[in-house]
């Protein structure tokens, strides 16, 4: 990769990170505890490739990083919600994510579910607010694409197939379906 592309990617990662750090800072109960659980997973690190790709796609389509930043952050929120739910005992029952205890290990299953739900709803709210500020329908279209890929024919379909295939002998077509929907379907 060219040095200027690496610099752009790192600058975009830092931009997204700063934006995410400004989310969910309410200090009253009950939101404070919920926001703490949401931030725990959202700010647990990661490469932020999905939001970086979102910013670059927007630029390629004539938009700016500033216009796309709420959508990029929303993509990361949706991704994080899916990881929180995937780690739950009823799903993959993972104890660690990115080298740290998973949300349900730190906050309990109930708050982990609510944190995931909260992130998904916050993503939709964030995109809705941003779309309302745009003079054309690009924001609504972006929101529709993101939520469709996160929904019942996208990531949720992959997770459902993963759950239903528990105990089956892995087949190439099954693994490909799960990966293309559960892992790769989110823009």
List each language-model region with its residue ranges.
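N-terminal leader/targeting segments and the immediately adjacent pre-domain N-terminus
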Residues: 1-18
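Mg2+-dependent prenyl diphosphate-binding active-site environment of isoprenoid biosynthetic enzymes
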Residues: 14-15, 21-187
């Amino acid at each position: 990769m060219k040095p200027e592309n690496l610099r752009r990617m790192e600058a975009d990662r830092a931009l997204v990170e700063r934006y995410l750090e400004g989310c969910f800072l309410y200090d009253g109960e009950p939101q404070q505890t919920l926001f703490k659980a949401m931030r725990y997973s959202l700010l647990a690190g990661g490469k932020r490739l999905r939001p970086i790709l979102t910013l670059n796609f927007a630029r390629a389509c004539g938009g700016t990083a500033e216009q796309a930043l709420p959508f990029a952050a929303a993509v990361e929120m949706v991704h994080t919600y899916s990881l929180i739910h995937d780690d739950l005992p009823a799903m993959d029952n993972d104890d660690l994510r990115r080298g740290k205890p998973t949300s349900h290990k730190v906050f309990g299953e109930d708050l982990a579910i609510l944190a995931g739900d909260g992130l998904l709803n916050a993503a939709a709210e964030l995109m809705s607010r941003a779309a309302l500020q745009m003079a054309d329908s690009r924001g609504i279209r972006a929101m529709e694409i993101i939520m469709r890929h996160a929904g019942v024919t996208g990531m949720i379909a992959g997770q459902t197939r993963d759950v239903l295939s528990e105990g089956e002998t892995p087949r190439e077509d099954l693994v490909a379906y799960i990966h293309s929907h559960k892992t790769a379907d989110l823009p």
